[in-house]
Amino acid sequence: MAHKKAGGSSRNGRDSEGRRLGVKKYGGENVIPGNILVRQRGTKMWPGVGVGMGKDHTLFALEEGRVAFTMRRNRQYVNVEVAAAQ
């Protein structure tokens, strides 16, 4: 008869850290070129007017303006609306 307690728990108890994905600038917020708008895996959201997409699908501002989210043909787009010069 074995005199050992169950020893499986030492192999458990680890997990990877969260990736900090999601929207970084919300609708109506002012942004400048280079600001990160959305960090994502794959194209959950698509770049619209005034927005670029990095190789890891990060969306970032190309122009100064205000963030706006729109839906078109079952795709969510992120736009930067440039304020009219005054």
From Swiss-Prot:
Q: Which GO BP annotation is one of this protein's?
A: translation
CC annotations in GO: cytosolic large ribosomal subunit
InterPro entries, A to Z: Ribosomal_bL27, Ribosomal_bL27_CS
Where do the record's region annotations for Disordered lie? Answer: 1-24
The protein's UniProt keywords, in alphabetical order, are: Ribonucleoprotein, Ribosomal protein
Pfam family of this protein, just one? Ribosomal_L27
Molecular function in Gene Ontology: structural constituent of ribosome
Protein family = Belongs to the bacterial ribosomal protein bL27 family.
Protein's recorded name: Large ribosomal subunit protein bL27
Q: Which organism is it from?
A: Magnetococcus marinus (strain ATCC BAA-1437 / JCM 17883 / MC-1)
Phylogenetic placement of the source organism: Bacteria, Pseudomonadati, Pseudomonadota, Alphaproteobacteria, Magnetococcales
